[in-house]
Amino acid sequence: MSAPDQDWEKVRDPAANNALIKAYLPGHVGVEFTSIEDGRVTGRLQIQQHHLAPNGFMHAATVVTLADTCAGFGCRHNLPAGASGFTTIDLTCSYLGTSTEGAIACVAEMVHGGRTTQVWDVKVRREGDDKVIALFRCTQMVLYPRA
């Protein structure tokens, strides 16, 4: 398997990014980008049985996959000049609710965009009633080519 084309971070079209993730974990889970802008990414996921835990409620990893994917693509699309990539150095997710059907959506926003780190906050909501079900935050270390 080959890595994605390194120029993909320049393309902010949600459809192009959805095609890119199709063969990777976010695509298999069903993550869909709805918008990609400076410092902001939105996405959604239609809940299916494989997103649920054995207790019938949405599995925590489903929420993290949606939130982390949107934050990660936000970081990638907002890297400083000269950066070659990023890696996650911290993430946390506070669950405030759950869902068993319908869809969930999120808004990822950059709260810090420095030369060496970025911090992204993500609110995950149920689409049906707009209830916030999770607050996610991740810190990304910005990577540069070795001299």
Kindly give the residue locations of the regions a language model identified.
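Terminal targeting signals and extreme-terminal segments of soluble enzymes
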Residues: 1-147
